Amino acid sequence: MARYRCCRSQSRSRCYRQRQRSRRRKRQSCQTQRRAMRCCRRRSRMRRRRH
């Protein structure tokens, strides 16, 4: 069960896989890659609005 986490603004197209080992970092995780891509776009929009 590999979950995808929201990717950073630098690389929107790529979504990083989140391992179950890393419980320290709590980031928005998605079960599918499509959801992760959505997260990326959302985050980028949010950041653009802020700046």
From Swiss-Prot:
GO terms for molecular function: DNA binding. The keyword Ribonucleoprotein does not apply. Testis. It is found in: Nucleus; Chromosome. One of its GO terms (biological process) is chromosome condensation. The keyword Disulfide bond applies. Residues 17-51 are annotated as: Disordered. Its main location: nucleus. Keywords: Chromosome, Developmental protein, Differentiation, Disulfide bond, DNA condensation, DNA-binding, Nucleosome core, Nucleus, Spermatogenesis. Residues 17-28, 35-51 have a biased composition (Basic residues). Transmembrane segments: none annotated. Cross-linked by interchain disulfide bonds around the DNA-helix. Belongs to the protamine P1 family. Protamines substitute for histones in the chromatin of sperm during the haploid phase of spermatogenesis. They compact sperm DNA into a highly condensed, stable and inactive complex. This is Sperm protamine P1.
